[in-house]
Amino acid sequence: SGIGEIAAAAASQLLISVYECEMIINYGIVGGLTPEMSLAKTCVVEKVVHYDFNLKFDNDMNPVYKKGEYPDFDGEIFVELDRTLIEIALKSVPELKRVTCASADKFVDTDDERKSLHDEFGADICEMELGAIAITCKRNGVPCLSLKSVSDAIGEDYDFKAMTRIASDACVKVLVDILKTL
């Protein structure tokens, strides 16, 4: 789809509308928000928050929505991914960690930002596409699965380009194992 929420939403809607996809499987690299989310750790996302969406006040400046909440989400800020697909993924690759993802059109590159996302949303990882993909799938009634591998971790020095390749390879290996069972 390319980088960012807009490209991801457009690609997801195209796949659903034109190709009538029965499910969307998203995979890619992410930033780790906790020490447990170490470099190349691969995980399955249970829920995602699109944290830069903000309709906090109405025209009279009264609080209306929580940060990350969409008007049609019934008070929820998280979009749940498909439980059946998550269970299939975990049966195929039991060592996958279930995680919460924070998603926005923003590259998070400081430990302070990472800590803030973890503290505010309980997120384990962050990235720039899944919020849009999950929302598009939810609105179209299409199941969604997301697999992510950590390319940059909190408090670690690394060669980003090298870690991107290592994390990508780790994620693809898990994806292939899961696809064999679908």
Summary of predicted features, one role per range:
Residues 11, 15, 84, 88, ...:
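Short, well-ordered amphipathic alpha-helical segments that serve as non-catalytic structural scaffolds
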